[in-house]
Amino acid sequence: DVSGPVIDLQPLQETEMDELLHKLRHVQAYGEAKNYLIDDMGLWQFMLQCRTIYGAQYYLNPRLAIKTLLDLLAILQQNPNAKVAELISEIS
C-alpha cells in the first residue's frame, strides 16, 4: 500500500545492527541473561556469518538477519544439546 505516507529509512549501521540482535536475544530470553541460548561470542559469530552470506543486504534489509537469528534461537530452544557453532556454520 503506497497510498499513505512513506518513511524513508536509512540502512542500519554496524553498531545498530549489533544492538538490534542483542536486544532480540534479550527479548527471546524473557529479559533474563541467564536464559540466553547463545552467548556473546556465538552472537558475534552469527553476525559474521550473516555478513558473509547476505553481504550488503545484511544492512539494507535487516529482516534477513532478524529472521535467521530468531530461527536459530528457536532451534536451540527445541534442541538444547545442539552445538551453536555447527548451526551457525550451516546458515545459508
Model-derived regions: residue spans:
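C-terminal alpha-helical "lid" subdomain
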Residues: 3-92
